[in-house]
Swiss-Prot record:
Belongs to the Mrp/NBP35 ATP-binding proteins family. NUBP2/CFD1 subfamily. GO terms for molecular function: 4 iron, 4 sulfur cluster binding; ATP binding; ATP-dependent FeS chaperone activity; iron-sulfur cluster binding; metal ion binding. ATP binds at G24, K25, G26, G27, V28, G29, K30, S31. The gene is CFD1. It comes from Eremothecium gossypii (strain ATCC 10895 / CBS 109.51 / FGSC 9923 / NRRL Y-1056) (Yeast). Pfam families: ParA (PF10609). [4Fe-4S] cluster binds at C201, C204. Component of the cytosolic iron-sulfur (Fe/S) protein assembly (CIA) machinery. Required for maturation of extramitochondrial Fe-S proteins. The NBP35-CFD1 heterotetramer forms a Fe-S scaffold complex, mediating the de novo assembly of an Fe-S cluster and its transfer to target apoproteins. Required for biogenesis and export of both ribosomal subunits, which may reflect a role in assembly of the Fe/S clusters in RLI1, a protein which performs rRNA processing and ribosome export. This is Cytosolic Fe-S cluster assembly factor CFD1. PROSITE patterns: MRP.
Length: 281
């Protein structure tokens, strides 16, 4: 039987590193984590892209303040939307189904084959140009969509996956399934981020545990996966996202002054310290 030839999509050939962001269930803040990972990398002067493949809940346009922007069609495919950074070096580009919908309230009611076709098109038909990092925001859970993503990326040799959890036991149980999925499809586990770990008071900035704490860290240790850090709920970050359209200063410039930026700078450093070689070597 002839061996199947796996070809890397041409659209990904100028990208040094590809990282998937996964979660075992919805509502854990995966898209927020993906956005902040992208901004923290861009703050280092790196060229970053974010591909939003969460087809039924495409929230990245709103997260980066680019709602209403249009995706252009170029000779080499769709051209992602550039997010203003206010920096001389680095960039942040975003592609999402949200840019293709007429209204944020439009629902995406598609059967599996149509979702699979859209995932394939997003991976193979978006022209990113040269990037240091491409972050892929995936749907929650494990489904046919995840299998399609894994199949489309086989020839691309992604760096691996970051898994987002919250401290509660029900979320941690779902993360175990995500870890098993990654191992079955040969995605390297770059680490676990425990999101919503505490609440930052908007008045005194004290962080208080409102859920259990340490569930993600314990699971990472138990599973032999790096633990990248804990992220609290910060109302100031939510306010920054919601009010950015009325401000002239670029989102990334605002983000560098937020209390969450140092946390994500450390998380990014933990990933970089793993020393994963460039795909382009």
């Amino acid at each position: 039987m002839a061996e199947e030839i796996v070809v890397e999509p041409e659209s990904l050939r100028e990208i040094e590193h590809i990282v998937l962001v996964l979660s075992g269930k919805g509502g854990v803040g995966k898209s927020s984590v993906t956005t902040q990972l992208g901004m923290a990398l861009a703050c280092r002067g790196l060229k970053v892209g974010i591909l939003d493949i969460d087809l039924t809940g495409p929230s990245l346009p709103r997260m980066v303040g680019m709602e209403g922007k249009s995706v252009l069609q170029g000779p080499r495919g769709w051209i992602p939307v550039d997010v203003p950074t206010g920096m001389e070096q680095g960039c942040l580009r975003v592609m999402s189904l949200g840019f293709l919908l007429d209204d944020r309230g439009d629902s995406v009611v598609w059967r599996g084959p149509k979702k699979t076709a859209m995932i394939k098109q997003f991976i193979s038909d978006v022209y990113w140009g040269a990037l240091d990092y491409l972050l892929i925001d995936t749907p929650p859970g494990t489904s046919d969509e995840h299998i399609s993503i894994a199949e489309e990326l086989r020839g691309a040799r992604p760096d691996g996956a970051i898994i987002v959890s919250t401290p509660q036991k029900v979320a941690v149980a779902d993360v175990k399934k995500e870890i098993n999925f990654c191992r079955k499809v040969n995605f390297k586990l770059l680490g676990v981020v425990e999101n919503m770990s505490g609440f930052v008071c908007p008045h005194c900035s004290e962080c208080t545990n409102i859920f259990a704490r340490g569930g993600g860290e314990s699971l990472a240790l138990e599973s032999g996966v790096p633990f990248l850090g804990t992220v609290p709920i910060d109302p100031a970050f939510v306010e920054m996202i919601e009010s950015q359209s009325s401000r002239e200063e670029p989102l990334i410039s605002l983000y560098k002054t937020s209390g969450l930026y140092p946390i994500f700078a450390r998380i990014v450093q933990h990933v970089l310290d793993q020393g994963i070689p460039s795909r382009c070597q």
